[in-house]
Amino acid sequence: MSRVCELTGKAVLTGNNVSHANNKTKRRFLPNLCQVTLISDALNQRYRLRVSAAALRSVEHRGGLDAFLLKASENELSMRARLLRRQIVKKTAEAAVAA
């Protein structure tokens, strides 16, 4: 399992620890990933995703998983999140036609 957020694409970065004497040693900056279960209102299902804490805040800020995925670009989403986004778009389009 890779260390990449499924919603934002945030991944591991590399850099240096720099001491007071300016000695540099390589290090990795790991994203703060959490396993969370998010509920899709349009599909009435629960989905377990591995997302960063920042992405979780963004999901709540935008008003839920559906709103976040509809506003997000497909480039930064994982393949699983892209499929979920397409299902939500299809379901909301069907609901709009029926109404």
Curated annotation (Swiss-Prot):
Signal peptide: none annotated. Disulfide bonds: none annotated. One of its GO terms (molecular function) is structural constituent of ribosome. One of its GO terms (biological process) is translation. InterPro entries: Ribosomal_bL28, Ribosomal_bL28/bL31-like_sf, Ribosomal_bL28_bact-type, Ribosomal_bL28_sf. SUPFAM superfamilies: L28p-like. Keywords: Ribonucleoprotein, Ribosomal protein. One of its GO terms (cellular component) is cytosolic large ribosomal subunit. Gene3D superfamilies: Ribosomal protein L28/L24. NCBIfam families: L28. Belongs to the bacterial ribosomal protein bL28 family. This is Large ribosomal subunit protein bL28. The lineage of its organism: Bacteria, Pseudomonadati, Pseudomonadota, Alphaproteobacteria, Hyphomicrobiales.
